Design a protein with these regions (language model features):
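C-terminal beta-signal and adjacent terminal beta-strands/loops
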Residues: 661, 670, 746-753, 771-821
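Gram-negative outer-membrane beta-barrel transporters
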Residues: 616, 620-627, 638-755, 787-788, ...
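Short acidic/polar hinge/loop motifs at secondary-structure boundaries
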Residues: 113, 128-153
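Repeated loop/turn-to-beta-strand initiation elements of outer-membrane beta-barrel proteins
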Residues: 213-216, 252-257, 385-388, 428-433, ...
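Outer-membrane beta-barrel domain signature, strongest for Gram-negative TonB-dependent receptors
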Residues: 239-436, 443, 618
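Outer-membrane beta-barrel translocator/receptor signature
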Residues: 143-145, 157-242, 247-255, 372, ...
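N-terminal Sec signal peptide and the immediately downstream disordered periplasmic leader
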Residues: 1-87, 93-100, 808, 820
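Structural signature of Gram-negative outer-membrane beta-barrels, strongest in the C-terminal barrel
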Residues: 432-444, 449-451, 486-627, 644-645, ...
C-alpha cells in the first residue's frame, strides 16, 4: 500500500488528523449513536437543520444493500434536494463544491456528466445505467430527491461501468419516508429569472390518488426554460417532464413506474481558438482571415473544395513537407510557404483584445436532443425479508450536433434492460446477513454518424465571426461524406451475486461477483461515408461489418470494522468490466472484430469514516488507486485507459438547527496508460506547440496535427484536472425565515492540453445565496462567481487542449419565487 499513493506525509497526516480530531468532540455521544438511529416507536429520526446532508439514511446505490454512507466501505457522497434548493444548484458543475473527487473539464461547454476521479463519469437513474452522455445534453437535476456520487467503478450488481465513478439520480418519490402515501396533495411552482435573459418555470406536485378502489401515490414534475446566454449565438430552450407512480397491487406486491422526457435545444461551445499563453494571461488574440475556398459560391466550404485546395485536407500531419517528422518541434515556417500548404496562410493579420463572449459557437450551430427514460419495478415481499424485484428500464436519445467550424454528429440510440433481484436477510446472535442474486439482460441499439476529418477551429476570426471562408458544409447538412456512419446492436446477458456479513462484534464483509456475456454486431453504411475514409479503413484492415461475442468477470470484496469513538476503517478491492462504447453508445466493427470492445479496471481503496454528536457530524477520508487492465483499449472521448491515484476527504456538520457546514479536499493524479505505453499520443498542435514556426498566421487557416512525445509518467498526466481542489460550504437559517448560504472552491492551476504548453491559472470561485420564506412563499437570490473571477476550463485535453479553451462565466444573478401548496 505504501507505493499506492505518493502524497506528502504532511498532507496525509493532516487529513487523517482532522478526522481523528472529531472524536475529541464526540466521545460521550458515541455510546448512544446506534440507539438514536430510530426512536422508541420505530420512527426515523430527523436531524433538523441538516438539509438532508447527513449520512443517516440507507443508500442502496453503492452495493444494493440498504446501508448508510457511514457504513458503506466506499467513497460516496449524497446531495439532497434541500441542499440543491438552498445553495441554488442548477447544473452538475455546481455539485463540485458539495462532493470531493469531482471536477469536470469542458466537453464543449455542455454539462453532461461529471469527471469523477479525473475521468468521465456515468449517469444512473434509480440504480440503472443510462446511455453515455459526455456532452450530448445537459443532465437535468431539478426533479431529483437526491443525487448519489459514487467514486470508483460500480458494484458488480450494476453491470459494466467506467473506472472513475457515477452519479445516481433518485427522482422524487410518490411516498413519504416510511413508505406510506401522502395524506393530501402538496406541490410548488417556481419562476426563475436572471442574467442574460434567464427564464425558467417549473412545477411539481405529489400526493395520493385513487382509481376505483385502487390507491396509489404520484409525483409529477415539469420544467420549461427559454434562456439566453452570456456567450454570443447561444441559448437554451428545453422542456422536462417527469412522473413517478407507486401502488400496492396486493399486500405483498408493489408496482413502481414512471419516466422522464427531455426536449433540449441549445449549442455546444468550443470556447476560444488560436490559443496562446498571452491570450489566457492578457486576452491578446491573433486576428486574420482565412483564404477563400468557396469556389461554387454557396457560402460554405465543402470537403471537395478543401481537397481541391490541399489534396488530403488541411490537417497537415507532422513536418514532412519541410524535412521534419511526426513531432511539433520538427515543423518550421518552410512547411507552409509553398503550394499547396500555403493555402493555410491567413491574410490581414493583427492582434486585438478578445471579449470572453466571443467563442466558436456560430449563429447556425445547434445541439438538439430528445431523450426518454422509462422504468417499471414489480416488488414482491415474501416471508421474513425475502424480496423479489423485477426492474424494467428504457433509455433513449435522438441527438444532432452541428458546429460551423467543421464538426457534426448524430445519435439515434436506445437501451432496454430487465433485471431481477432476489434478496433475503437473516439475523441471529452472530450478526446480520444479507444476500442478493441478480440475472439481467440489457439490449442496446445504436445508429451513429460523425464528421471530424475537416475540423478547423482556427479558420474563423472570433472578432469577426463566421464567413464563407470559415463556415463548413457539414455531413449532417448534406447527409453525405461522414467519417463514421455505423449501425448495430449489442446484448449483455449477465448473472450477479452479492453477500453482506455484518457480524455482531463489529466486522462487516461484503463480497460480490458478476459474469457478463456480450454479443455485438456493427456495420458501416459505406454509401454515407467519405470515400477516402472507407479506403483508409480498408487499408488498415478494418472490416466494413463485424459480429462477435466476449465474456467478462467482475468482482469486489470490502470490509469495515466499527471501532470505539465512532471510527470505521474500511478497505475495498474490486475488478469491474467496462464496455468501450462511443459518444452515442456505438460499437465499431474493428473493435468487435478485434475483441477490444470490452475491458476492465481494478480498484484498491482504503479509508476511515465516522459519525458523531448524535449523527450531526460526519467525516471521511479515503485513498485509492484505480487503473484499467488493458492499456491499448480506450475511447479517447468518453472512456480513457487511465491510472488514477488520489485522496478524498470531507466533513459535514450540522452544528445546530440553524447552521450547516461542509468541506472537502481532493488530491488527484491521472495518467493516460495508452499514451505512456505507446510513448506518444495523437493530438492537434497549438500555437505554443509549434516552437519552430516563427509566424503562426502561416498555418491558422488549417490544422497541423501529429504526435506528442510521452517519455515519462509525468508527460502522461491527464491535463485539465487539478492536483489539489478544496471546497467549503456553509448555510445559516434564522428563525424568521431568512437563510444565507455560500460555497467556494479553490482550484490549482492546470495545463490546457497533453503537451503541457499552455497553463491555465489557479482560481477561487465563490457562490452565495439569500432566501426568505414566509407562509407558502419562498424568495431566493443567487449570485454565482461573486468576486467576478476570470477563469478557464480546459476542453477535451487529449486531442484539442493546446488549440482551444473555454473562458468561464463572469458574475451572474438568479432570482426565483416559489409558491408552495
Amino acid at each position: 500500500m505504501r507505493d499506492m499513493i505518493r502524497f506528502t506525509a504532511r498532507k496525509t497526516v493532516l487529513a487523517a488528523g482532522a478526522l481523528l480530531c472529531c472524536t475529541a468532540l464526540t466521545t460521550p455521544a458515541f455510546a448512544q449513536a446506534a440507539a438514536d438511529e430510530t426512536t422508541e416507536d420505530g420512527k426515523d429520526i430527523v436531524v433538523t437543520g441538516s438539509l438532508g446532508a447527513l449520512p443517516i439514511e440507507g443508500v442502496g446505490t453503492v452495493f444494493g444493500f440498504d446501508k448508510t454512507v457511514t457504513e458503506t466501505p466506499r467513497s460516496v457522497s449524497t446531495i439532497s434536494a434541500e441542499q440543491m434548493e438552498r445553495f441554488g444548484i442548477t447544473d452538475i458543475y455546481d455539485l463540485v463544491a458539495q462532493s470531493p473527487g469531482t471536477f469536470t473539464n469542458s466537453f464543449f461547454g455542455v454539462g453532461g456528466a461529471l469527471d469523477i476521479r479525473g475521468t468521465p463519469g456515468e449517469i444512473y437513474f434509480r440504480g440503472m445505467r443510462r446511455l453515455d452522455n459526455p456532452g450530448n445534453y445537459p443532465t437535468p437535476i431539478g426533479a431529483s430527491e437526491r443525487i448519489d456520487i459514487v467514486r470508483g467503478p460500480a458494484s458488480p450488481i450494476y453491470g459494466p461501468s467506467k473506472t472513475g465513478g457515477y452519479m445516481n439520480f433518485v427522482p422524487k418519490s410518490a411516498r413519504v419516508q416510511g413508505g406510506s402515501y401522502l395524506a393530501s396533495p402538496e406541490g410548488e411552482v417556481t419562476m426563475t429569472g436572471g442574467s442574460w435573459r434567464k427564464a425558467d418555470i417549473k412545477a411539481e406536485m405529489r400526493g395520493p390518488g385513487k382509481i376505483g378502489t385502487q390507491e396509489f401515490g404520484y409525483s409529477l414534475f415539469a420544467e420549461v426554460e427559454d434562456s439566453g446566454s452570456y456567450y454570443d449565438n447561444m441559448s437554451t430552450r428545453q422542456t422536462i417532464l417527469q412522473g413517478s407512480f407507486d401502488t400496492d397491487l396486493t399486500p405483498n406486491l408493489r408496482l413502481e413506474f414512471g419516466g422522464m422526457y427531455q426536449n433540449y435545444k441549445g449549442q455546444q461551445n468550443g470556447g476560444w481558438n488560436r490559443l496562446t499563453q498571452d491570450l489566457v494571461d492578457n486576452g491578446t488574440y491573433i486576428t486574420g482571415s482565412a483564404k477563400p475556398l468557396d469556389t461554387n459560391g454557396d457560402g460554405q466550404i465543402s470537403q471537395g473544395e478543401i481537397n481541391a485546395a490541399v489534396p488530403g485536407g488541411m490537417s497537415i500531419f507532422g513536418g514532412f513537407a519541410c524535412g521534419g517528422g511526426v513531432f511539433a518541434s520538427s515543423i518550421t515556417d518552410a512547411c507552409f510557404t509553398s503550394s499547396p500548404n500555403s493555402a493555410l496562410n491567413l491574410t490581414n493579420v493583427g492582434t486585438a483584445k478578445l471579449s470572453r463572449r466571443k467563442t466558436l459557437t456560430g449563429k447556425n450551430d445547434r445541439l438538439d436532443n430528445k431523450g426518454s427514460t422509462l422504468y417499471a419495478d414489480l416488488i414482491w415481499k415474501g416471508a421474513g425479508d425475502l424480496e423479489i424485484k423485477n426492474q424494467f428500464f428504457f433509455d433513449s436519445y435522438d441527438n444532432i450536433n452541428e458546429n460551423s467550424y467543421g464538426f457534426s454528429q448524430f445519435h439515434d440510440s436506445y437501451a432496454i434492460e430487465n433485471k431481477v433481484v432476489i434478496s433475503d436477510k437473516f439475523e441471529n446472535d452472530i450478526g446480520k446477513f444479507a444476500f442478493q442474486v441478480s440475472p439481467s439482460i440489457r439490449y442496446t441499439n445504436f445508429k451513429h454518424g460523425d464528421d471530424f476529418n475537416y475540423e478547423y477551429f482556427h479558420r474563423v476570426d472570433l472578432t469577426v465571426g463566421y464567413t464563407p471562408a470559415s463556415d463548413r458544409l457539414l455531413s449532417t447538412e448534406c447527409d453525405c461524406d461522414y467519417t463514421n456512419y455505423v449501425t448495430g446492436h449489442y446484448t449483455d446477458y449477465s448473472i450477479a451475486a452479492l453477500a453482506d456479513f455484518d457480524f455482531s462484534f463489529g466486522l462487516d464483509v461484503t463480497v460480490g461477483a458478476r459474469y457478463d456475456y456480450l454479443k455485438a454486431k456493427s456495420a458501416y453504411n459505406i454509401g454515407k461515408m467519405e470515400a477516402a475514409q472507407v479506403a483508409s479503413n480498408r487499408a488498415d484492415g478494418i472490416p466494413d461489418s463485424a459480429s462477435g461475442n466476449k465474456g467478462a468477470w467482475s468482482w469486489s470484496a470490502s470490509a469495515n470494522y466499527k471501532l470505539p469513538y465512532g471510527l470505521i476503517p474500511y478497505a475495498t478491492i474490486a475488478r469491474q468490466s467496462t464496455v468501450i462504447a462511443g459518444q452515442g453508445a456505438e460499437l465499431y466493427p474493428g473493435d468487435i472484430a478485434g475483441q477490444t470492445f470490452v475491458s476492465a479496471s481494478k480498484l484498491y481503496e482504503g479509508g476511515l469514516k465516522g459519525s458523531w454528536l448524535d449523527d450531526r457530524l460526519y467525516a471521511a477520508v479515503s485513498i485509492y488507486k484505480q487503473k484499467r487492465t488493458d492499456y491499448n483499449i480506450q475511447s479517447v472521448t468518453v472512456n480513457q485507459s487511465v491510472e488514477t491515484k488520489g485522496l478524498e476527504a470531507e466533513f459535514r456538520w450540522s452544528v445546530d438547527k440553524h447552521l450547516l457546514i461542509t468541506g472537502g479536499y481532493t488530491r488527484t493524479k491521472v495518467y493516460n496508460l495508452t499514451a505512456l505505453t505507446n510513448g506518444t499520443l495523437f493530438s492537434f498542435f497549438g500555437i505554443e506547440d509549434l516552437v519552430n514556426v516563427s509566424d503562426p498566421s502561416l498555418y491558422l487557416g488549417g490544422q497541423p496535427i501529429g504526435l506528442v512525445p510521452i517519455t515519462s509518467k509525468s508527460d502522461s498526466r491527464r491535463a485539465g484536472i487539478p492536483t489539489n481542489l478544496y471546497s467549503l460550504t456553509a448555510t445559516y437559517a434564522f428563525d424568521n425565515g431568512l437563510a444565507l448560504s455560500a460555497s467556494g472552491v479553490k482550484v490549482d492551476s492546470v495545463y490546457s492540453g497533453q503537451s503541457q504548453a499552455v497553463k491555465l491559472p489557479a482560481y477561487t470561485k465563490i457562490d452565495a445565496a439569500i432566501s426568505y420564506e414566509t407562509g407558502p412563499w419562498l424568495a431566493r437570490l443567487v449570485v454565482k462567481n461573486v468576486t467576478d473571477k476570470k477563469y478557464f476550463r480546459a476542453n477535451f485535453t487529449e486531442l484539442f487542449g493546446s488549440t482551444i479553451v473555454l473562458p468561464e462565466l463572469p458574475r451572474s444573478f438568479q432570482a426565483s419565487l416559489t409558491y408552495k401548496f
